[in-house]
């Protein structure tokens, strides 16, 4: 995966800032996002064309942080386990927070560049090594815990091939480029996990429906002119499709799909002017109505996971 400058800038700001008591820490937000992402990506693996092994562990790297961020503690490696979700394959295999990751299936994990500087390149390279492995084959990880090195074998499960990041600080936005989903840190202060899941499912809907590739194929442009004319219509169509697909993704993951309707009806005002402020996005009222109409078409006895007819649009050009 490629570095994302906006995330890096936000990360520096988060570490430098003094957070108010009500604001979740970066680790707390990362943990909440990891739980939501685990549910959505594993439950909807059958709907994702590109998949990867999912372990339930989140990685970070020393060069994502300013010098001295780890205090006097010497990190076990350049890439570390930030958190492990309970009950996941990583937890069952014995991975723990702060374990250093040295190799993936015998392939060495890159070492952080000596010249320093804030970058997610090292972390991304480690994630790419894992993502490139078979989705359901045993995954041997060479780790360092303290001064001892060992191999821990994780039995992953298939999940959608996409990574997740918290945009730390007061950002209320959310975005997806087809490879990485970024969720604004302020959402974790404003909303509970079920509500944040609506936003995450929407962004995952973009990935499932291949919106980045389809928008590029349609000749869409990003930037100041993206809101106008045919370009604006293309983006609005993609946003509506992601809303509808997101409701199905929620349902497949055990969330109440109607929570998406409730979110836009009751919380839309909190994000209007922030998360979905431009004319490339429908109004909150229109979003709620479209999702309600779509869910009314789902068969009462629909299987889980449900593959809605909407899924076929990922191979069709945007009109």
What do these predicted ranges mean?
Residues 20-62, 68-75, 127-135, 140, ...:
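C-terminal capping/extension segments of zinc metalloprotease domains
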Residues 210-231:
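Post-HEXXH active-site segment of zinc metalloproteases
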Residues 1-8:
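Bacterial N-terminal signal peptides that target proteins for export
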Residues 80-88, 117-132, 137, 184-185:
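N-terminal post-signal-peptidase region of extra-cytosolic proteins
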Residues 62-100, 237:
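Mid-chain, structured segments of secreted extracytoplasmic proteins
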Residues 89, 184-198:
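Short pre-active-site segment immediately N-terminal to the catalytic Zn-binding motif
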Residues 90-118:
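Conserved PDZ fold ligand-binding element
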Residues 8-16:
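Bacterial N-terminal signal peptides
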């Amino acid at each position: 995966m490629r570095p994302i400058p906006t995330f890096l800038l936000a990360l520096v700001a988060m570490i430098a800032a003094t957070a108010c008591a009500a604001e979740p820490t970066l680790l707390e937000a990362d943990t909440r996002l990891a739980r939501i992402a685990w549910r959505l990506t594993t439950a909807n693996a059958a709907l994702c064309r590109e998949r990867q092994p999912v372990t339930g562990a989140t990685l970070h790297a020393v060069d994502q942080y300013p010098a001295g961020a780890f205090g006097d503690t010497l990190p076990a490696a350049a890439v570390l386990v930030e958190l492990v979700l309970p009950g996941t394959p990583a937890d069952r295999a014995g991975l723990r927070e702060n374990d250093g990751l040295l190799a993936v299936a015998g392939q060495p994990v890159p070492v952080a560049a000596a010249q320093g500087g804030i970058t997610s390149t090292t972390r991304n390279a480690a994630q790419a090594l894992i993502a490139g492995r078979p989705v359901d084959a045993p995954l041997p990880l060479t780790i360092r815990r303290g001064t001892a090195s060992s191999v821990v074998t994780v039995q992953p499960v298939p999940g959608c091939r996409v990574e997740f990041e918290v945009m730390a600080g007061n950002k209320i936005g959310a975005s997806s480029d087809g490879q990485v989903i970024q969720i604004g840190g302020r959402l974790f202060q404003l909303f509970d996990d079920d509500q944040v899941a609506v936003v995450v499912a929407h962004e995952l809907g973009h990935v499932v429906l291949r919106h980045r590739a389809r928008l590029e194929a349609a000749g869409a442009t990003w930037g100041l002119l993206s809101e106008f004319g045919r370009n604006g219509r293309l983006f609005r169509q993609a946003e509506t499709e992601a809303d509808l697909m997101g409701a199905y993704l929620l349902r497949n993951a055990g969330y109440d799909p109607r929570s998406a309707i409730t979110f836009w009806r009751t919380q839309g005002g909190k994000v209007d002017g922030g998360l979905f402020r431009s004319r490339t996005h429908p109004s909150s009222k229109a979003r709620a109505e479209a999702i309600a109409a779509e869910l009314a078409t789902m068969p009462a006895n629909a299987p889980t996971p449900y593959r809605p007819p909407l899924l076929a649009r990922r191979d069709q050009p945007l009109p």
